[in-house]
């Protein structure tokens, strides 16, 4: 059974993915990881992360996957004893120079996708150095993954959902070249997600069409700096493999990884929950397994750039034209109290709320839950809607906590 590995950028996200079935979580510190712009944890948070995760029977992996220069690698090496004392399970490394020290401190050494592992010979070498697992390159096909995993002496891990990079294994210099902010040190400003115009100065024609027979649609190269043809051709769609769970499991890989430490708790909750349901459905009865279209609909409801299967079955060419979730989260209140015996939450609402509205409640202990309002009371009287600045009781089967945040989910099509 493959491990379902989910991202955690903060304690709310951590709880959200664990509540929705993550077998393991990965996270970064303020330094040493590829999401420097995300809200990361401090080294003093590691013991708390470990303890919370153990309550769910989940493993914990710390990302240290940037390019480490001399001062940084020595600082990280000096911190290994403190990291190990927190009782997390392992480190995700992009520098093989740390494998020996990581293992000597009782931590598993997992090799990052930034190492661009694309063959079994590399895996055999990593095994000799002491690595327990390697994340395979995103640029491999499903057949290549199956063959590599079959020959590998260590565990393999693959990405199954989330953002894809235009550069091989994320080794991009575009952000550094334009802004002096290095993607390889976790500080990418993602200029690839912007619209671009490609110019072809040698051409005598104002518009030159590419002549590749691989692309389904031609793109335009302008020679006159005319931004009529501006597009986001550097921006790939998000990977989504929810329609291919049986094929993924048959590869024999040990871990399925969801990308998204910089994304919201509701993203982590939804994506983790959907893949958990699909994986469990297949494993419970492989012969009778059927793909459920609602899984795709649910994944589309949270932030995405459109979906693609990456390199699993072919070379991807489609670029993302979308950059949003199905819903807008509107901050409408906070939890005042939760009455466990009657399953009622008292909410302080500073916006309109009515029967049929879909809400989301998030908190460090609660994680992220969604609920459709089907019953509300004010001072013991049933109401169908409430106005701003009201305290209202809502029948809620999920336990929530005081000061949890309350959001109303509004479809973008209604805006």
Predicted ranges, named:
Residues 131:
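Residues lining hydrophobic/aromatic ligand-binding pockets adjacent to catalytic sites
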Residues 1-117, 121, 136-139, 143-257, ...:
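Active-site pocket-lining/capping segments in soluble small-molecule metabolic enzymes
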């Amino acid at each position: 059974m493959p491990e379902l590995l989910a991202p955690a950028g903060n304690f709310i996200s951590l709880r959200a993915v664990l509540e929705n079935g993550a077998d393991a979580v990965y996270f970064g510190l303020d330094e040493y990881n590829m999401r420097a712009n995300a809200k990361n944890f401090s080294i003093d948070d590691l013991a708390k992360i470990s303890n919370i995760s153990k309550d769910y029977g989940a493993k914990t992996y710390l990302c240290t996957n940037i390019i480490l220069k001399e001062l940084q690698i020595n600082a990280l090496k000096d911190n290994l004893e403190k990291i190990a004392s927190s009782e997390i399970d392992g480190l995700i490394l992009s520098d093989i120079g740390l494998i020996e020290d990581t293992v000597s401190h009782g931590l598993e050494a997992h090799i990052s996708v930034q190492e661009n592992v694309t063959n079994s010979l590399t895996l055999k070498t990593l095994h000799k150095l002491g690595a327990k697992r390697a994340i395979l390159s995103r640029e491999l096909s499903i057949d290549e993954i199956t063959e590599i995993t079959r020959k590998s002496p260590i565990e393999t891990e693959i990405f199954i959902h989330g953002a894809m990079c235009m550069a091989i294994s994320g080794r991009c210099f575009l952000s550094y070249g334009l802004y002096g902010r290095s993607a390889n040190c976790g500080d990418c400003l993602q200029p690839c997600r912007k619209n671009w115009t490609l110019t072809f100065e040698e051409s005598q024609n104002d518009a030159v069409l590419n002549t590749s027979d691989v692309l389904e649609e031609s793109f335009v190269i302008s020679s006159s700096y005319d931004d009529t043809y501006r597009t986001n051709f550097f921006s790939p769609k998000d990977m989504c493999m929810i329609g291919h769970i049986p094929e993924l499991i048959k590869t024999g890989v040990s871990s399925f990884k969801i990308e998204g430490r910089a994304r919201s708790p509701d993203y982590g909750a939804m994506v983790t929950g959907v893949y958990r349901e699909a994986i469990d459905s297949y494993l419970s009865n492989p012969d009778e397994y059927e793909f459920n279209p609602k899984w795709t609909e649910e994944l589309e409801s949270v932030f995405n750039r459109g979906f693609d299967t990456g390199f699993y079955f072919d070379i991807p060419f489609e670029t993302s034209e979308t950059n949003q979730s199905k819903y807008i989260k509107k901050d409408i209140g906070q939890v005042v109290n939760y009455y466990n015996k009657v399953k009622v939450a008292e909410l302080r609402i500073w916006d309109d709320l009515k029967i049929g509205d879909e809400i989301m409640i998030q908190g460090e202990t609660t994680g992220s839950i969604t609920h459709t309002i089907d019953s509300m009371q004010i001072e013991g009287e049933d109401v169908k809607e409430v106005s701003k600045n009201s305290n209202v009781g809502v029948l809620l089967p999920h336990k929530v906590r005081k000061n949890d945040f309350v959001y109303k989910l509004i479809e973008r099509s209604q805006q």
